[in-house]
Amino acid sequence: MTVSEIRVRKINPRAKIPKRQSEGAAGYDIHSVESGRIPPNGRKSVRTGLAWDVPQSVVGLVFGRSGLALRNWIEVVETCVHPGEDKELVITLVNNGREVFEYEESSRIAQLVFVPVLSCEIDLVESLDLTERGCLGFGSTGMK
């Protein structure tokens, strides 16, 4: 499946059109349209000023930016951009740090990755086929 264009509309004239910051990057950087402060252990919904029109075969997944997490303890609450939505994308940021986090208008706060959607029929069964992995997980293969 190839999708060459995804439409976006500016709801706020200060909104910045997202772009990938490096060749081969999967995520498009999303900017805030406002400045703000998030206290330690606080959260805030941050406006982007953009509404998206994604095709039926695609969903946009919002992820955090590794630098914000590493340096500022900022986490992004996962958000999806679904086909047919026409409202502003609002991103919730969580401050897991000990300091107030301040951001400015046009700050890159998250990244948006577009992925294809696979539609499946869900089949309720009494049991599942056994696999080699079975019920293992949660570190069962070790660290090295």
From Swiss-Prot:
Pathway: Pyrimidine metabolism; dUMP biosynthesis; dUMP from dCTP (dUTP route): step 2/2. The keyword Nucleotide-binding does not apply. GO terms for biological process: dUMP biosynthetic process; dUTP catabolic process. It catalyses: dUTP + H2O = dUMP + diphosphate + H(+). Its cofactor is Mg(2+). Transmembrane segments: none annotated. It holds the Pfam family dUTPase. The keyword Metal-binding applies. DUMP binds at residues 66, 133, 138-139. Keywords: Hydrolase, Magnesium, Metal-binding, Nucleotide metabolism. CDD domains: trimeric_dUTPase. One of its GO terms (molecular function) is dUTP diphosphatase activity. Its EC number is 3.6.1.23. Gene3D superfamilies: 2.70.40.10. Coiled coil: none annotated. Belongs to the dUTPase family. Involved in nucleotide metabolism via production of dUMP, the immediate precursor of thymidine nucleotides, and decreases the intracellular concentration of dUTP so that uracil cannot be incorporated into DNA. Homotrimer. This is Deoxyuridine 5'-triphosphate nucleotidohydrolase. It comes from Encephalitozoon cuniculi (strain GB-M1). The lineage of its organism: Eukaryota, Fungi, Fungi incertae sedis, Microsporidia, Unikaryonidae. The gene is DUT1.
